[in-house]
């Protein structure tokens, strides 16, 4: 503790100034020290700030006297002389304060002598009473536990009184955990006496509810406080992990490619073989012309017409009355052969007609070309438009003729005459009429 004589001397020193405020003196003293002794003030201001936050008034243990507790008081008092002069005590106090930078590393020296209790006398007395009560209750519960464990040797009245005593006692979770009284009471839940059995079940239910409430409260407190960073492994992993490289997102984006699939297919012929550059350019020019559309359309229609007989053919549903299915299969096979032969015959005129049309297109009269040369752009456009419509009409007529020929060649399914069955009743009736 700080010597009372040093504080009294300084108290008298400040009181001589009259009605001056002590806090005003402190403020002005700091200003004067910072102005007159700036270097020394810088070296000591850390200790001054530490002194401001470390000074506290504590109540002495054993009496109600208030004492000032300042770290490093004992060392300062050891260095003071026996004359009790206030000036020397204060100077040595400041010497200790100024030399505290070395003592920060050795601040743990003599901590047992410098520790001052932060509890007041009433708090310390209440704490001691609580500890004493805990020990007394624990001893009583341990005594009752021994009685309950020896339930075979004890009468029912003693067991019942022990359980009632436990019910009247206010037990907490610490006592239940330290004494393990729950195991002893749980063994009485199947006792022969109804009162003992019922009282044991009641105690177990109350203690279980108490423990559940304590667990829930603990979880809520820990959840509110939050887990420390050391308990969170992800934080440690992030700190110990290598720093991530500053990747640029644009590096991973694919470069734009100007190659189009349409150009790839244009460079191939119908068989999948690559064309020459000249053939590729000429094919591109022919595709742009409208005549190519007129040439391709009848080909698709011709293929559709050729496939029509095969799609329209259905197996005959005629059945043989003799019960055997073999003649039915033979008849369907013969019919399919006849239809294929007729289709092949119908294809011959179509194949012969195609070159005729192309030859007619290829043969263009010379005077007609000369007339086209003399016309302007609008007249040429109208002429090409009329020719295109005529070619469309020609192909439509050819398409109708082919469909009519194919439909005439397909045999009608309903034309086959079904054999007439003779009813046995009619023959018997005729036979009876003949006898008459």
UniProtKB/Swiss-Prot annotation:
In this chain, composition skew of type Polar residues spans: 427-436
Q: Which gene encodes it?
A: MED26B
- Region spans: Disordered: 71-111, 263-376, 408-436
The cellular location(s) given in this protein's UniProt record come to: Nucleus
* Residue ranges of domain TFIIS N-terminal in the record: 139-214
Question: Which N-terminal residues, if any, form the signal peptide?
Answer: none
Give a short account of what the protein does. Component of the Mediator complex, a coactivator involved in the regulated transcription of nearly all RNA polymerase II-dependent genes. Mediator functions as a bridge to convey information from gene-specific regulatory proteins to the basal RNA polymerase II transcription machinery. The Mediator complex, having a compact conformation in its free form, is recruited to promoters by direct interactions with regulatory proteins and serves for the assembly of a functional preinitiation complex with RNA polymerase II and the general transcription factors.
Q: What is this protein called?
A: Probable mediator of RNA polymerase II transcription subunit 26b
- Belongs to which family? Belongs to the Mediator complex subunit 26 family.
Basic and acidic residues: compositionally biased ranges = 276-290, 332-350
Q: Which GO terms describe its molecular function?
A: translation elongation factor activity
């Amino acid at each position: 503790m700080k010597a009372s004589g040093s504080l009294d001397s300084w108290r008298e020193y400040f009181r001589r100034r009259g009605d001056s405020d002590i806090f005003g003196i402190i403020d002005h003293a700091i200003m004067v020290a910072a102005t007159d002794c700036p270097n020394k003030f810088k070296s000591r201001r850390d200790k001054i700030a530490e002194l401001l936050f470390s000074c506290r008034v504590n109540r002495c243990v054993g009496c109600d006297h208030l004492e000032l507790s300042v770290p490093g008081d004992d060392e300062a008092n050891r260095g003071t002389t026996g004359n009790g002069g206030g000036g020397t005590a204060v100077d040595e106090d400041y010497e200790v304060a100024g030399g505290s930078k070395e003592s920060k590393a050795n601040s743990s020296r003599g901590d047992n002598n410098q520790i001052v209790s932060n509890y007041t006398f009433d708090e310390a007395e209440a704490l001691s009473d609580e500890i004493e009560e805990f020990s007394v209750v624990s001893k009583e519960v341990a005594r009752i536990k021994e009685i309950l464990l020896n339930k075979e040797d004890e009468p029912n009245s003693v067991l019942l009184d022990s359980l009632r005593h436990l019910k009247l006692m206010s037990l907490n979770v610490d006592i239940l955990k330290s004494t393990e009284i729950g195991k002893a009471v749980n063994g009485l839940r199947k006792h022969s006496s109804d009162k003992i059995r019922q009282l044991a079940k009641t105690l177990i239910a109350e203690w279980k509810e108490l423990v559940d409430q304590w667990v829930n409260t603990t979880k809520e407190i820990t959840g509110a406080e939050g887990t420390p960073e050391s308990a969170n492994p992800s934080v440690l992993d992030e700190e110990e992990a290598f720093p991530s490289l500053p990747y640029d997102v644009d590096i991973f984006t694919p470069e734009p490619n100007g190659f189009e699939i349409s150009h790839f297919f244009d460079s191939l012929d119908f068989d999948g073989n690559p064309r020459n550059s000249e053939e590729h350019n000429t094919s591109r020019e022919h595709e742009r012309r409208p005549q190519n559309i007129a040439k391709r359309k009848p080909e698709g229609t011709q293929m559709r017409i050729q496939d029509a007989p095969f799609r329209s053919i259905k197996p005959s549903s005629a059945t043989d009355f003799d019960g055997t299915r073999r003649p039915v299969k033979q008849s369907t096979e013969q019919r399919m052969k006849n239809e294929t032969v007729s289709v092949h015959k119908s294809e011959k005129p179509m194949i012969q007609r195609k070159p005729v049309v192309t030859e007619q297109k290829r043969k263009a009269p010379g005077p007609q070309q000369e007339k086209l040369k003399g016309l302007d752009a609008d007249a040429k456009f109208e002429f090409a438009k009329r020719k295109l419509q005529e070619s469309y009409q020609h192909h439509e007529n050819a398409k109708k003729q082919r469909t009519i020929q194919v439909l005439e060649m397909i045999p009608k399914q309903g034309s086959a005459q079904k054999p007439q069955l003779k009813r046995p009743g009619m023959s018997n009736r005729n036979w009876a009429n003949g006898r008459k």
